[in-house]
Amino acid sequence: MARLLIAASGTGGHLFPALALAEHLPDYQIEWLGVPDRLEQTLVGDRYPLHSIAVEGFQTRSVLKNLQILFKLIRGIFEVRHLIKTHHIDVVFTTGGYIAAPAILGARLAGIRAILHESNFIPGKVTRLLSRFCDRVALGFAGTAQYLPKAKTVWVSTPVRSPFYTPQPLDLPIPENVPLIAVIGGSQGAIAVNQLVRQCVPSWLAAGAYIVHLTGKNDPEAETFKHPHYFALPFYDNMAGLLQRANLAVSRAGAGTLTELAITGTPSILIPYPFAAEDHQAYNAQVFADAQAALLYRQAELTPEILENAVLNCLKHPETLESMAKQAQRLAVLDSAQQLATLVNGFVQVT
């Protein structure tokens, strides 16, 4: 039996593509590498053996703190090497983030293959630094290759989980014949977007819309507005059903979410997270805006009035939503997970 180590941690954007790949490798023994007390503890659960190492990113100007982080990284590299040896791992797959550094370098130290998936249009620091040490870098956006001239890249888009490919019933009391707005802040929520949206909700409800607002778990005002047609939820595990049913999404622009919007053909208003590393969400969103699959607004320029009217204008012009939906579907790559699985299989066979 082939053995794969998946290193994916922290956010849905890192975890969901890795889970989608794992679904397409049913005959593999999969070990999962994460970080203590992160989202993988919930999402991976007992589906795969979960191993944790204590690593973090270099995000401080303190020399002492950076030395401590460097020590953790070096220790993590040897912990990964030990994990690879004791579990007879054939290939390492990672979706980036700081867990990727010990995973990639540990694979090199152990003498096995490493595959990195970069979902964002602008590659992260770890990807730029370590892509040359990977046997292949799979890309979520074709245009990303220009930023990784020394890497062996292949464009596969970003995989999504299997429920997105089949109709999923929405288990919320929402009639079929009413417009539905889905507000998505990503796996960690988006308080700034939440605050904007709550000021717009009364007018959207007055226009006859229902609203499912995924607030995240850290919004202290999440339950301040009540209405029978407004559903404020910290997290919703039937994202496929929600996006398939939604007439319009108001969303951040993480690569995983954008891929899900494309697969489901959901028109969107995108508000990139302004503090994302390298402003990568803005670049992700621009691809969708250029394709006329989404409307793009920068958070610094967005007022409640602008957002309110943008949504109302979309609801008043269903032909616009229909056109945006078609353009979103044209961006979808339906076999992304299978392409990644084939890539992994190829490296196992030559190991």
UniProtKB/Swiss-Prot annotation:
GO cellular component labels: plasma membrane
Presence of keyword Electron transport: no
Coiled-coil residue windows: none
Membrane topology: Peripheral membrane protein
Pathway it works in: Cell wall biogenesis; peptidoglycan biosynthesis
Enzyme class: transferase
Subcellular location: Cell inner membrane
Reactions catalysed according to its record: di-trans,octa-cis-undecaprenyl diphospho-N-acetyl-alpha-D-muramoyl-L-alanyl-D-glutamyl-meso-2,6-diaminopimeloyl-D-alanyl-D-alanine + UDP-N-acetyl-alpha-D-glucosamine = di-trans,octa-cis-undecaprenyl diphospho-[N-acetyl-alpha-D-glucosaminyl-(1->4)]-N-acetyl-alpha-D-muramoyl-L-alanyl-D-glutamyl-meso-2,6-diaminopimeloyl-D-alanyl-D-alanine + UDP + H(+)
Entry EC number(s): 2.4.1.227
GO molecular function list: UDP-N-acetyl-D-glucosamine:N-acetylmuramoyl-L-alanyl-D-glutamyl-meso-2,6-diaminopimelyl-D-alanyl-D-alanine-diphosphoundecaprenol 4-beta-N-acetylglucosaminlytransferase activity; undecaprenyldiphospho-muramoylpentapeptide beta-N-acetylglucosaminyltransferase activity
Keyword Nucleotide-binding attached: no
Binding sites annotated in the UniProt record for UDP-N-acetyl-alpha-D-glucosamine: T11, G12, G13, N120, R161, S187, Q281
Biological processes, Gene Ontology terms: carbohydrate metabolic process; cell division; cell wall organization; lipid glycosylation; peptidoglycan biosynthetic process; regulation of cell shape
InterPro entries hit by this protein: GlcNAc_MurG, Glyco_trans_28_C, GlycoTrans_28_N
Keywords for this protein: Cell cycle, Cell division, Cell inner membrane, Cell membrane, Cell shape, Cell wall biogenesis/degradation, Glycosyltransferase, Membrane, Peptidoglycan synthesis, Transferase
Pfam families noted in UniProt: Glyco_tran_28_C, Glyco_transf_28
Function: Cell wall formation. Catalyzes the transfer of a GlcNAc subunit on undecaprenyl-pyrophosphoryl-MurNAc-pentapeptide (lipid intermediate I) to form undecaprenyl-pyrophosphoryl-MurNAc-(pentapeptide)GlcNAc (lipid intermediate II).
Entry's family note: Belongs to the glycosyltransferase 28 family. MurG subfamily.
NCBIfam families: murG (TIGR01133)
Protein name: UDP-N-acetylglucosamine--N-acetylmuramyl-(pentapeptide) pyrophosphoryl-undecaprenol N-acetylglucosamine transferase
Organism this protein belongs to: Rippkaea orientalis (strain PCC 8801 / RF-1)
